[in-house]
A protein has these predicted regions:
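Walker A/P-loop NTP-binding motif
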Residues: 36-52
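Signature of the SF2 helicase/ATPase Hel1-core->accessory helical subdomain module
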Residues: 128-179
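Inter-Walker segment of RecA-like/P-loop motor cores
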Residues: 64-120, 207-209
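Short hydrophobic/aromatic beta-strand immediately N-terminal to the Walker A/P-loop
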Residues: 25-28, 148
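Conserved RecA-like ASCE P-loop NTPase motor core of nucleic-acid helicases/translocases
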Residues: 54-66
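ATPase catalytic-site recognition across NTP-hydrolyzing enzymes
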Residues: 179-216
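Walker A (P-loop) phosphate-binding loop of P-loop NTPases
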Residues: 32-33
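Pre-P-loop entry segment of helicase/translocase ATPase cores
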Residues: 1-24
Length: 216
């Protein structure tokens, strides 16, 4: 996999994280910052090009959301770079084999899979949607590293209180300004929030934690 790949800064975050001694990479960010897409690019073009015979779990709270977002992006990337091979795609199990690595897509409404086999790399998309118990079940079965991304749309959350404070975490915050590929029309719509909705601008424009009601 030596072809030219268009990435943004989030890809570099993943590259540097995996070569560090930290266990958890946290990608907090606003809308359209390219978090999810570039984490997938990193998994495909860095992690899977170096390693083989690994199990990579990509998860979100419910399967419809998983299919409509991160799964769609994953297969779009494979097809864009001519890596997709239908023989490697187990559609019934939502798995794909890449360089002898198994990439499995599971949702938290599949408890048997959550409590199933161990994995080497875990990516939780929109991690703020899941509860503390689900997080614990996932990390107990992850032998390697963990990547999470989310929009900080809650003013309080276990991620802030129990994960960000760990000493084995690398934290990044990104916004639409970190994504050179964003459509100009989307930039205009996001920047309208400055005048129309301060709370939405805080979260989806600036990638900052939502204000509590006492702060508004």
């Amino acid at each position: 996999m030596t072809q030219r790949v268009e990435t943004n800064i989030v890809f570099n975050h993943g590259y540097n994280f995996y070569r560090s001694d930290k266990k958890i990479l946290i990608e907090q960010g606003g809308s359209r910052s390219g978090k999810t897409y570039n984490i997938l690019l990193w998994i495909i073009f860095d992690y899977c090009s170096i390693y083989s015979d690994k199990i990579i779990t990509v998860t979100r709270r419910v399967m419809p959301s998983l299919r409509a977002t991160v799964m769609r992006d994953f297969f779009e990337i494979l097809r864009k770079y001519e890596l997709y091979d239908e023989e490697n795609h187990n559609k019934s199990n939502s798995e794909y084999i890449l360089n002898n690595n198994i990439i499995e897509f599971i949702s938290l409404d599949q408890p048997a899979k959550i409590r199933g086999r161990k994995r080497n790399l875990l990516f939780i998309n929109e991690a703020n949607e899941i509860d503390w118990e689900s997080w614990q079940q996932l990390i107990f079965r992850t032998e390697g590293k963990i990547v999470i991304d989310y929009n900080p749309s809650e003013s309080t959350h276990w991620i802030y209180d129990k994960v960000l404070v760990r000493d084995d975490v690398i934290f990044y915050k990104t916004t639409y300004k970190d994504n050179p590929f964003i459509d100009k029309g989307l930039i205009t719509e996001l920047e309208r929030l400055k005048e129309t909705d301060e709370e939405y601008w805080q979260v989806f424009g600036l990638g900052e934690r939502a204000l509590s009601r006492t702060q508004i």
